[in-house]
Amino acid sequence: MNKVLIIAAHPDDEILGCGGLLSNLRDQAEFKVVFVAEGTTCRYDKPSCQEAQKEIELRNGFAVKALNSLGVTHYCFYNLPCGRLDNTPQIEINKIIEKEIKLFSPDTVFTHSNCDSNKDHHKVYDATIIATRPQSLVKRVLSYEVLSSTEWGFDKAFSPNVFYPLTEKNVQDKWDALEFYETEIKEFPYPRSEKGIKTLASYRGLQSGHENAEAYKLIRGTL
């Protein structure tokens, strides 16, 4: 992996899914993160209200700090409506991802899993598959897991087939980055807690013969 594009429905998904990888490869690969939607207005009856718009700016600021802590300086925010991507024409999302692939020319793309309970994640997954057709420059496409979403997809469980080993420092860096999203974390047993993040890393390591790991599913291509 030399140029890696991470596609996230909302700010914080990128850290939850790929934070350890970002830490481990920060000096070995070039990364860009694309945020398709904002992550807050689904909590408001009127998404266009001033308070909701301030929350979007706040959360985008969290994302910048989190990514900078992991050495990532390439990112962009499209701020489509959170929780409402099912009302957004699929082609609009497709075009966003196609545009970013053309601009960045990645060899590897990470995106959401189609097993997630979150419908926005499904829309982003579908758009990624369309935008990374076999004739594109992308050599491999992988999906990642997002705590508080992937594990709730009870009808269609996430079945990883790629495990990326992480050091203790990588796991700590992942948590430290997630902490910038101060409105999105809580105490254990909430999944997006320090213990939750570290427990999942340990479990994925147990599955793959490592002390810690992040899990992915290879959708297309070779490693």
How would you name each of these model-derived features?
Residues 1-7, 24-28, 53-54, 68, ...:
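Metal-dependent de-N-acetylase/amidase catalytic core
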Residues 3-52:
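ATP-dependent adenylation/pyrophosphate-handling site
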Residues 16-17, 58, 92:
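Short, conserved clusters of charged catalytic residues that mark active-site
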Residues 41, 46-70, 74-75:
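Glycine-rich phosphate-binding loop and adjoining beta1-alpha1-beta2 segment
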